[in-house]
């Protein structure tokens, strides 16, 4: 990337047949319906005062970011999975059902579901490699060897899981929208007009991607686990579970660091492992998928501009 002042950072994620983008004040999802139209799901960003305090504390802000992303991501995934294959004539019925279950309770339930889903997957990818590595102890008994083998099993499980997911038609399209999301962000950060042609000319990889974060948890975990014993097995399992927040917190800081130094020769290499993983989690999007991502991002920019304008103090002219 060229050296320039980067505009305000926006994040996003791919959903079923669409893309969600989040800003300081709003979240916007755009999806392509079966009739070819583009539908939007817009929500104001809820700022929890306590969570906002935590988000300013290094190593803890990563946990807060995961909680927030889990809550909002689940809502937008639900919208996309429910709407993309639904006939537009059925929208009103679905909206009435959604209103009955809206409110704080729905937000909290989605947050819990999102966090629990993340933790479950983290437990699986954390504990299964522990037991697999333990099987090799008769041959590799040293602490460092056990940790290295455990990390290798984690990487194999992760890559295998992503590869088999990508073979399904639905997830392949989600990965294409993931690529479209990155391309739009890269185009925006290059200060280029956000057109289909300009967006398609951008890389489908990005330093701030959550895929990179997942890979960093494996790398960071390998070093953190060197500080604790690997024997006996029961203590090793407890250590791995107890250290999940620590690994997540450090990994988030590493992700932020790689994004900050991405324009510095030599240091930008720190982010390469995450970019390599994105070669699996993103695919080159089609023009119509890029159009959806652009519509989502432009709508977010419009809402963000309105919010910023409304927050400016008015001056009465006398």
From Swiss-Prot:
Main location, first listed in the record: membrane
Transmembrane segment boundaries: 112-132, 147-167, 209-229, 237-257
Record membrane topology: Multi-pass membrane protein
Disulfide bridge map: none
Gene Ontology CC terms, in alphabetical order: plasma membrane
Keywords assigned: Cell membrane, Membrane, Transmembrane, Transmembrane helix
Subcellular location: Cell membrane
Domain of life: Bacteria
Protein name: Uncharacterized protein YqhQ
Species, as recorded: Bacillus subtilis (strain 168)
Name of the gene this protein is made from: yqhQ
